[in-house]
């Protein structure tokens, strides 16, 4: 079993190659982002996307009720079904779903979040309402396993369900990591728009899971959460690679051992 995750920018720029590469796998689950497309649709509707930075330096989309509606419609609907259609064009059956289906992914709605903001020259931390953002608490694998066993590729949008029945925006990298752990996946592949984790302009070939959180502090928003999640998954025995999703046949990184590998 291989779990693959691609962020929105990477996916939108190279969907055919990513889907074609996954289509060759016997057993695969695909988790997708799509924030850029959400931003585009929000602006069409006269809304401005909201982003915050957590106290730990993780950039995230702040999701109020109106933004949640667009997020679910675009990621759980339009983009998700475009990906399913792309799989069909390569002769591979796929089923589009979210973590709310089943339900497969249960998350706790964040009541408050601590964010950091620049006020003049100072970095100030303050608490704000959590909106419709969730932290994953439980993964139920029955539905996803059943689809995989039938030779289908589950295409999962990063939307979870709260115990109270609320739809929640969850981080796509966390969604992929939690699914990989729950499914005891052999590999978790995080496709991004750079060749791997970069330091001083060079790809870091390997990171130990015990060092992941420290390394994450040295890289920018977007990559830091990938490294943190990769470290947590790798510590459980799943092989994790962060590699270039913009190239032809991006999953060749598994054979070539390219990109950045996160190891126990």
UniProtKB/Swiss-Prot annotation:
- Which positions are annotated as binding substrate? 34-35, 61, 169
What Enzyme Commission number(s) appear in the record? 2.7.2.17, 2.7.2.19
Q: Where in the cell is it found?
A: Cytoplasm
- Report keywords, A-Z: Amino-acid biosynthesis, Arginine biosynthesis, ATP-binding, Cytoplasm, Kinase, Lysine biosynthesis, Nucleotide-binding, Transferase
* Catalysed transformations (reactions): [amino-group carrier protein]-C-terminal-N-(1,4-dicarboxybutan-1-yl)-L-glutamine + ATP = [amino-group carrier protein]-C-terminal-N-(1-carboxy-5-phosphooxy-5-oxopentan-1-yl)-L-glutamine + ADP; [amino-group carrier protein]-C-terminal-gamma-(L-glutamyl)-L-glutamate + ATP = [amino-group carrier protein]-C-terminal-gamma-(5-phospho-L-glutamyl)-L-glutamate + ADP
Job description of the protein:
Involved in both the arginine and lysine biosynthetic pathways. Phosphorylates the LysW-bound precursors glutamate (for arginine biosynthesis), respectively alpha-aminoadipate (for lysine biosynthesis).
The protein here is known as Putative [LysW]-aminoadipate/[LysW]-glutamate kinase
